[in-house]
Amino acid sequence: LIAAINNISFKKLLLGSLFLHLWATYFSTGFQHFDEHFQIIEFLNLKWGGIKEAQLPWEYHDKIRPWFQTFLYYWLSAPLKLLGVENPFFYSWYYRFLTGLLGWSATVYFMNLLKSWFKEEHLQKWGFIILNFLWFAPFVHVRTSSESLSISLYLFGTIIFLTKKEMRSFFIAGLLWGFTYHARFQMALPVAFVWFYALFLEQRNLGRLIYSALGVLVAIGFGTAIDFWGYGEWSFSLWHYYRTNFIEGRLAGSGHAPVWEYVRWGVFRGIPPLSLVLVGITVWGWVKMWRHPLTWM
């Protein structure tokens, strides 16, 4: 079986991965988490005039939600609206298709890093297979969630940052990271760790970090303008997120868990015993290859 897989061409692997993603866009229904619908799709529904502001959740009224993802869906579906397409189920599929296509493209683009990390072609293939053919990968990629969009943008930005040499490429990486941040604020942390890796382990030229930081700032500026489009007034959603969750204490209602709880979730929600292998290999990699960029990503 392993020999047969090693003989499969990259083209067939790409087509197989694309097929699984398209399959997932059609057979996925509903939402994985309430936020995926009520804080993205319903915000979009407001712009289309299908719902009133009073019907939206408290996150809208407290202005803690960035509008970047909703803005993308709005303009990408505008031509269909002009053509008279009104079926909400079609739009649900369409947004899954767009998000899934971006996620698939990000993992395909990840081959640039795999080829620099592994010189043997069969190892490159197995890296691609793990990224694309684990049962949860296509499902996660097609979700219209902030997690899915932000991870795809983050991968594009990180791959450009780690593989390109031109200064403009670092600026583009920063733009993608800035939009990653506007898709999901928490993604600022992995971006910071890529910077730490570049600064302390690779000892890259500080100018490259500055160019990427400028890209982040420009993207944040665009994101702030998009929030104005969404809320109808100037608003800095990150501040409101911090204010409501950490000063006013709304976050307390969602429960607390220690960091190591993610390990337990990974084991029990990732379908044992395969999840035990995945978690074990990940922890082993962090310990044995702590200087590798993948550890810092």
Give a label for each model feature.
Residues 22, 26, 135-141, 157-161, ...:
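Membrane-interface alpha helices of multi-pass inner-membrane proteins
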Residues 93-119, 156:
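Transmembrane-helix motifs of polytopic, lipid-linked glycan transferases
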Residues 101, 114, 122-136:
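Transmembrane and membrane-interface helices of multi-pass
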Residues 105-112, 130, 136-137, 149-175:
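Specific aromatic-rich, kink-prone transmembrane helix
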